[in-house]
Amino acid sequence: MNDDWQIRLTQYLEYIQGTKNVSPHTVSNYRRDIEQFLEFLRRLSTGDFMFNAVDVLLARRYLASLVGKDYSRKTIARNIAALRSFFRYLCRVQV
């Protein structure tokens, strides 16, 4: 996986800090949640993983992995919110 993901994540976190008026705690949680998803992608892929390769089935597979780790419903809901917001941002900036 290339550095594009990390660059986009950094840009996204700066965006939500500057425009969405979210708490530093939320930014920290979102960073951790999205980085956990990126690590999931890294484990699945042997090469670069493109933004447009993420689909509903892959997202469901990731969420199933969270359920398998016995995360609370609140934690899973926050993960979903973080990923939804991140991918909406990626669409908005036309990645």
Predicted feature locations:
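N-terminal core-binding DNA-recognition domain of tyrosine recombinases/integrases
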Residues: 10-25, 31-95
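A detector for short, charged/polar N-terminal pre-domain segments
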Residues: 1-7
